[in-house]
């Protein structure tokens, strides 16, 4: 049976991850730790014999720079890369820039967990005159008003990620190309939920660690037959638990 592989990678730790802030579409840089994480991911992929034919990422530099660091390590800097806003992080609305623990102290752990992990729950909206509104950013100039979010739930994130998967990425993977996607915690959760047909309850508890390669194997019908992380299982579990704890009051 022919097996096709796909690699998903959440970006390395960003400056706002380090500060425990809601980031969303805010374009923040990787921290020093995040750059190191991305480099280690690339080294791990190289050691495991992975090479790629094509790459996808978002239009946010923490994901783009994660991909660059990985491609440096596997010595494929020349690889064709397609960037799309449809792979952006979920838009966190008026929460963007706020500290997660302080927000939990104000609104309670359960409310923040629902904002972060609830399937159809949207954070408070931005207003269009807010400087954080994506309509003010030139990289989104081609988007229609309906496409510019004021906030997003995971369900709404799925609504933009899955058509991009079906129409753009999946045909390339199905053709036999070896593809890597460098994106974000929630855009990747959206894709994992779709690929694995997860329930809303299951996706609530899924936390994707930073810069750990997640490998999918597909059969000839593009049905997922295996999903696994590369790396030390205990370290990966600890990183995933740290992601889960970000939204709790101290």
Curated annotation (Swiss-Prot):
In chain numbering, the residues marked as site (Transition state stabilizer) are 184
Which InterPro entries would you find in this protein's record?
His_Pase_superF_clade-1, His_PPase_superfam, PG/BPGM_mutase_AS, Phosphogly_mut1
Cite the SUPFAM superfamilies for this sequence: Phosphoglycerate mutase-like
- Metabolic or biological pathway: Carbohydrate degradation; glycolysis; pyruvate from D-glyceraldehyde 3-phosphate: step 3/5
One GO molecular function term of this record is:
phosphoglycerate mutase activity
* Keyword entries, A-Z: Gluconeogenesis, Glycolysis, Isomerase
Chain residues that bind substrate: 10-17, 23-24, 62, 89-92, 100, 116-117, 185-186
Give the E.C. number(s). Answer: 5.4.2.11
The protein's matches in CDD domains, at most eight in alphabetical order, are given as:
HP_PGM_like (cd07067)
* Single GO biological process annotation from the record: gluconeogenesis
Q: Which HAMAP family match?
A: PGAM_GpmA
Quaternary state and interactors: Homodimer.
* PANTHER family associated with the record: PHOSPHOGLYCERATE MUTASE
Protein family (similarity comment):
Belongs to the phosphoglycerate mutase family. BPG-dependent PGAM subfamily.
- Protein name as it appears in the record: 2,3-bisphosphoglycerate-dependent phosphoglycerate mutase
């Amino acid at each position: 049976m022919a097996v096709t592989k796909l690699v998903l990678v959440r970006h390395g730790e960003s400056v706002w991850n380090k500060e425990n802030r809601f980031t969303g579409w805010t374009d923040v840089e990787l921290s020093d730790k995040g750059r190191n994480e991305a480099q280690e991911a690339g080294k791990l992929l190289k050691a495991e014999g992975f090479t790629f034919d094509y790459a996808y990422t978002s239009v946010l530099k923490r994901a783009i720079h994660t991909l660059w660091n990985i491609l440096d390590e596997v010595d494929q800097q020349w690889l064709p890369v397609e960037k799309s806003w449809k792979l952006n992080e979920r838009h966190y609305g008026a929460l963007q820039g706020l500290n997660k623990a302080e927000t939990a102290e104000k609104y309670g752990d359960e409310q923040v967990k629902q904002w972060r992990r609830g399937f159809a729950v949207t954070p408070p909206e931005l207003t269009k005159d807010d400087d954080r509104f994506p309509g003010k950013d030139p990289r989104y100039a081609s988007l229609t008003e309906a496409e510019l979010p004021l906030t997003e739930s995971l369900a709404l994130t799925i609504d933009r990620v899955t058509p991009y998967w079906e129409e753009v990425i999946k045909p390339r993977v199905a053709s036999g190309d070896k593809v890597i996607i460098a994106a974000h915690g929630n855009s990747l959760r959206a894709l994992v939920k779709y690929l694995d047909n997860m329930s809303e309850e299951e996706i609530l508890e899924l936390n994707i660690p930073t810069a750990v390669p997640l490998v999918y194997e597909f059969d000839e019908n593009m049905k997922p037959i295996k999903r696994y992380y590369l790396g030390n299982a205990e370290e990966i579990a600890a990183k995933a638990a740290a992601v889960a704890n970000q939204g709790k009051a101290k």
